[in-house]
Regions:
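Long, charged amphipathic helices and adjacent flexible linkers at domain junctions
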Residues: 223-228, 364-415, 422-423, 492, ...
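Structural motif
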Residues: 237, 407, 424-426, 445, ...
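Short beta->alpha connector loops at strand-helix junctions that form conserved
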Residues: 40, 447-449, 468-471, 560, ...
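Conserved alpha/beta-domain cores
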Residues: 92, 517-520, 527-879
Length: 879
């Protein structure tokens, strides 16, 4: 008989895919002797069975749940649904990966009217019993039936206001009894049925809600953001309740074994007295720092420190630990690898190596490649910060700096981001419903919550700047206003600037400056460089981009797009005159001017390269992109060329194409206008000789774009070789150079063995290769690709991660056929996929020489290349 339910004692940390991350760790902690309340786990197999059976929870699975529930009754000495001594449980989702989009926790399940009275009589504490029941009704209504939580909060606020209470803890048993009646009314009005009194029915509904949450929109969005496979499913954790809301010797908290923002080796966290677990995460009350527990309960604090050390040494990673204190006794409810910033991830990984806990290889595999984005982006410019007006200070929940316009709803934040507006999402507190808005925002600001609230944890995981618990601000999400302590109101669209490292909120925009990296980052990157096989180059067209990339560890230029040099406002008139020239002499006279400009560009790049590879792609776009569209520009051009406006307009119309991206561009320009590529080749070689004569090694790579046939490349190569040889003869010097091609047309992949006869190198232009393979326009595909993801037609954006079965198969074919002709043919990638970690793993497996990407993605590519090499070496998956 297939098994779907497991006692904690039956599991281990290795069973994460079956028991979920939370369940596997509860099992592990039970087995190493930590004080974990007993319970059991419904496996991910049960979730997949539920999904496969049209969202029906089978009787066989529920019978197995009842068997384990009976065992839990024996372990606790309590009976589920028995009024005199009721067993109460918590129900939590538990996917194999931590997922903020999943169902929230339900506490105190098993309470009903009779059990609440029984609990009050048993403990002699009616207030605590009623408080637990009202919390359960709210959680059950919110989580299982999706009744908006604010409806319950409004009822609570009314009673507090009527009695002039400031805190929830001021409510007495009579107040709470009244609140329970109000909550039941809210439930019945929202659902059309009374609040369920049968505990087994409560449990069945909660299990179904967990399974349903696996496919809710929040979870789907989160999985898409983090490339998590939907087939994993989620487990359900059912655990005997312990109570943190039974007075001042009870409480609840979350602690990290190291600081999740900085990586510092110091316990970091928060706790609330007389509260239950979700109070800390929900951010409804502002908690105390964990250090304050030393004064409140020194024995518990000492035991907690021991637990932190034990768990970190057991898992050999920073842990995020959830705990409850019941009448002075510590219980551990959860441990997991703590979400952390990139700075913390790198410091912790390097420190763990230095402490002898893990190897350098393990440290490399431990840091998530995409997290490095956090380290490489701007901070506030110090000079600008001096004039900044601080309007509030909250908790520095996730480091970094951001400036943007404020929006109060996640949906509106997404819409604004799609319009290119820099967004700061402002909320009283965030919830899983806000996940997409958070992902699209530059920063998050909340009035409530602490350093371990939903906003803080999710923002750190995303690498977003976040300030939480900013109680000085009054946020009205309905009226979309932010009231400052001065009485001034800000509205949607107003600018704020946030420093997530200090918690300070500034009025207006503050200029940003480049991030500073070093120390632990450089050490980890040095370890990565020692492991990787792929070289990492940069796509750079300007000296500033190239210099920046070299600081990030680039090993040369993999793509210099010469057309970008032509768009300078001082150069574009000459480019236009060259295109519109009516004779060869007229065109060559303008090309001579452009040649000197290009020589200056190339010389500077060669000097900065200092012997590193520089791959220069010759003119690629269709000519119409350079031509004027505005009437005033056409008139200016006509005057400069001594032509009439109609003459210029007619010529522009002649050059216009119905489908320019598949038209007269790339190498096709060199077939009809060979003088253009000849000029560029001469500029490259002459500038290389200038720099060579300065004592700097130069070995330029000249790349011909859009080649479809061997004959195209052969014709252009011959023309260029003749021009280059003439320079060598004139200058009496010879320098090494290579002529190769971009492989970006499917036909070039199929005939790569022929093209390799003429090419010194292949550089895969995966952007155009993806467009031409799919027949998608990269600029327009976003209009319909979202439907493809939603309907599972495509798993992800093929312009972000290489389509291994289609585009990838063409690349593999070209690699194989190219090497049939030239065994040591140099091959690399210069499309956007060159900076994507998943694609880099694929390119490593193909044995390419290098990948090339934008400057800020160079460190990501370095780490991804090392992880790919280690994955191959040890046959382990990359992160």
């Amino acid at each position: 008989m297939r098994k779907f339910v497991y006692q904690f004692s039956e599991g281990s940390k290795e069973m994460k895919n079956l028991l979920g991350g939370k369940g596997a760790n509860l099992a592990e902690m039970t087995n190493i002797g930590l004080p974990v309340p007993p319970g059991f786990i419904i496996s991910t197999d049960a979730c997949n069975d539920y999904t496969a059976n049209n969202k029906h929870l089978s009787e066989a699975i529920f019978e197995e749940v009842k068997i384990h529930l009976a065992e839990l009754e024996k372990q606790t000495g309590k009976i589920f649904g028995f009024a005199e001594n009721p067993l109460l449980v918590s129900v939590r989702s538990g996917a194999p990966f931590s997922m903020p989009g999943m169902m929230d926790t339900v506490l105190n399940l098993g309470l009903n009217d009779q059990a609440t009275e029984g609990l009050a009589n048993l403990t002699g504490d009616a207030r605590s019993a009623y408080d637990s029941y009202r919390r359960f009704i709210q959680m059950f209504g919110d989580v299982v039936f999706e009744i908006p939580s604010y409806q319950f909060e409004q009822a609570l606020s009314r009673i507090k206001k009527a009695n002039d209470y400031r805190l929830d803890t001021e409510l007495n048993a009579t107040d709470l009894s009244e609140l329970i009646d109000a909550y039941k009314l809210i439930f019945s009005q929202a659902t059309g049925t009374d609040f369920p009194q049968a505990p087994l029915e409560q449990l069945r509904l909660a299990i179904i809600a967990v399974f349903n949450s696996w496919m809710n929109p929040r979870a789907v969005i989160y999985r898409r953001l983090h490339d998590i496979d939907a087939s994993f499913g989620t487990a359900v954790n059912i655990q005997a309740m312990v109570f943190g809301n039974t007075g001042e010797t009870s409480g609840t908290g979350i602690t990290f074994t190291r600081n999740p923002s900085t990586g510092e080796k110091k316990v970091f966290g928060e706790f609330l007295l007389n509260a239950q677990g979700e109070d800390v995460v929900a951010g409804i009350r502002t908690p105390e720092p964990i250090s304050a527990l030393q004064e409140r309960m020194p024995t518990v604090y000492k035991e907690l420190l021991y637990t932190c050390e034990l768990l970190e040494n057991h898992y050999l990673d920073m842990q995020d630990i959830e705990f409850t204190i019941e009448k002075g006794k510590l219980y551990v409810l959860q441990t997991r690898s703590g979400k952390r910033t990139a700075k913390a991830a790198i410091q912790a990984a390097v420190d763990f190596v230095q402490e002898g806990k893990i190897t350098r290889e393990e440290a490399i595999m431990r840091v998530e490649t995409k997290q490095l984005n956090q380290l490489l982006h701007p901070t506030f410019l110090e000079s600008a910060l001096k004039n900044g007006q601080v309007i509030a200070t909250g908790l520095p929940a996730s480091p970094g700096a951001a400036t943007g316009q404020i929006f109060f709803e996640a949906k509106e934040a997404v819409q604004a981001a799609e319009r290119g507006i820099p967004v700061i999402l402002v909320r009283n507190e965030t919830s899983p419903e806000d996940i997409e808005g958070m992902a699209r925002s530059n920063a998050i600001l909340t009035a409530h919550g602490g350093m371990t609230s939903h906003a803080a944890v999710v923002a750190r995981g995303m690498g977003k700047c976040c300030i939480a618990g900013c109680a000085e601000l009054i946020i009205n999400e309905h009226e979309k206003t932010l009231l400052l302590s001065t009485g001034e109101a800000l509205h949607e669209g107003d600018y704020l600037s946030l420093n997530g490292s200090t918690g300070k909120v500034y009025l207006g925009e503050i200029s940003l400056t480049e991030a500073q990296i070093g120390g632990h980052f450089n050490e980890l990157m040095a370890w990565a460089d020692a492991e990787k096989r792929l070289m990492i180059r940069v796509n750079a067209d300007t000296p500033s981009d190239f210099k920046k990339a070299l600081l990030f560890g680039a090993e040369g230029i993999g793509l210099c797009r010469t057309e970008h040099m032509f768009f300078d406002e001082k150069r574009i008139p000459y480019v236009r005159q060259m295109i519109l020239a009516e004779s060869l002499n007229e065109r060559e006279s303008v090309l001579a001017i452009l040649k000197e400009m290009q020589k200056a560009d190339f010389s500077e790049l060669f000097r900065i390269a200092d012997g590193r590879a520089v791959n220069i792609r010759l003119l690629d776009p269709p000519l119409h992109e350079f031509l004027p569209k505005m009437k005033q520009e056409i008139e200016q051009l006509a005057g400069a060329m001594n032509r009439t406006v109609p003459q210029i307009t007619n010529r522009i119309n002649e050059l216009r194409e119905a489908n320019p991206m598949l038209g007269h561009r790339g190498c096709r320009l060199a077939i009809t206008f060979p003088e253009i590529y000849r000029m560029q080749a001469e500029a490259i070689i002459e500038s290389a000789i200038i720099v060579h004569n300065e004592g700097i090694d130069v070995h330029p790579e000249i790349m011909i774009p859009l080649i479809a046939t061997k004959n195209e490349l052969s014709y252009i190569k011959k023309e260029m070789q003749q021009a280059v040889q003439a320079i060598f003869d004139r200058e009496q010097v010879v320098i090494p150079y290579d002529i190769g091609t971009m492989i970006e047309i499917p036909r070039a992949c199929v005939t790569a063995d022929e093209i390799a006869e003429e090419a010194a190198f292949f550089s895969f232009g995966t952007n155009d290769l993806t467009q031409l393979t799919y027949g998608f326009s990269r600029d327009d595909a976003t209009k319909f690709l979202a439907d493809y993801y939603e309907k599972d037609i495509l798993p992800k954006d093929p312009f972000v991660s290489i389509d291994k079965n289609g585009v990838g198969a063409l690349v593999e074919m070209a690699v194989t056929r190219g090497r049939m002709t030239s065994e040591h043919l140099k091959m690399g990638v210069c499309g956007e996929h060159g900076g994507d970690p998943e694609s880099i793993q694929f390119f490593h497996q193909l044995g390419l020489s290098y990948v090339s990407c934008s400057p800020y993605r160079v460190p990501i590519a370095r780490l991804a290349a090392a992880q790919a090499a280690l994955a191959e070496k040890h046959l382990i998956p990359t992160i």
